[in-house]
């Protein structure tokens, strides 16, 4: 049973993953723009990934691997990427998976302070079924936004988890308000 957390973030954040040795897989079939590739080329390991057919991987440990792919759905500019964290250890509990994932989120939120007025964040918890085994995870999407509506993450915390609903606080520093995002109900 895999537990998957998906990040969508601006290419300039790729340096963060290399600096802190967080792994990622790179799909060789995806055309990576030069401005993004320069952040990644020193971390690419040309080795087949046994967990994801057709992907190359840079391994960090036995429990986690990250998948990197380019999202160019908006216009012709591939300014965002998707990074998938997949827990390969079946013994990892849902709560522990979330705890580990939030560690990355806290670190990313600290990094985001360097890019004031450039990113927003959307989080949700999701129930995933792969074959006959249920999988748990939550989406963490960092969106690059422009103009006066942009804001950065100052504080991020889980303040309630009840009946499979994960609720997170996001402090919008531009508008000085809390945004609360409720996940769909998780039924096992």
Regions found by a protein language model. Give the residues of each.
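Polyanion-binding interface signature
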Residues: 85-95
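Intrinsically disordered, low-complexity boundary segments flanking structured domains
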Residues: 109-110, 127-129
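Polybasic, proline/glycine-rich intrinsically disordered low-complexity segments
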Residues: 129-188
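A short glycine-rich, hydrophobically flanked beta-strand micro-motif that places a catalytic Asp/Glu
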Residues: 120-128
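Short, hydrophobic/π-rich interface segment
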Residues: 93-120
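A structural detector for beta-sheet-dominated domains
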Residues: 10, 33, 86, 124, ...
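N-terminal leader/targeting segments
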Residues: 1-86
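A generic structural signal for short, solvent-exposed coil/turn residues
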Residues: 77, 115, 132-134
